[in-house]
Amino acid sequence: HLPFYRQHQRLTDSGINVSRPWLTQLGQQGAGLLEPIYDAQFASIRASRVKAIDETPIKAGRASPGKMKTAYFWPVYGELDEVCFPFFESRRHEHVEAALGLTHTEGAVLLSDGYSAYAQYAEKAKITHAQCWAHTRRGFYEAQAVEPKAAAQALELIGELYEVEAHIRAQQLSGARKL
């Protein structure tokens, strides 16, 4: 990825003179041609029984001179290894519903971090919410100061799961063979 202003500068440096607005329009038209593919891929993700979501901040748009606004990509991953990156200007809870909708396959599971928007969405959509092990492990790690014995036991069990995952990766297992 290279911002349009840098692409424009490289073209100009190479003796190719085009306007920056034309370059922007060309990019927008190209993205428009890809929209049906994006929509089909997103529909496949929404139909997945298991899907994962996370939000990640980016700087986009000017908040004031010299300062950029924070916006968010919300990568969504489906069980057929599809990924889409919906964009929203904030981290508000309703963006989860806007991205995933409320119609789900029976037994659907949403895998995410501990952000409360995901748990609220799962409850509203009547699906199972599962946290990723890295975030779950962090809670037990922090609990060692309060409940050292129980936290250590939980961390040991999570470590065993990590060992199973390492074995799966080392053996390059896929699909049902992972089970």
Please annotate each region the language model reported.
Residues 1-179:
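Catalytic center-proximal scaffold of phosphoryl-transfer enzymes
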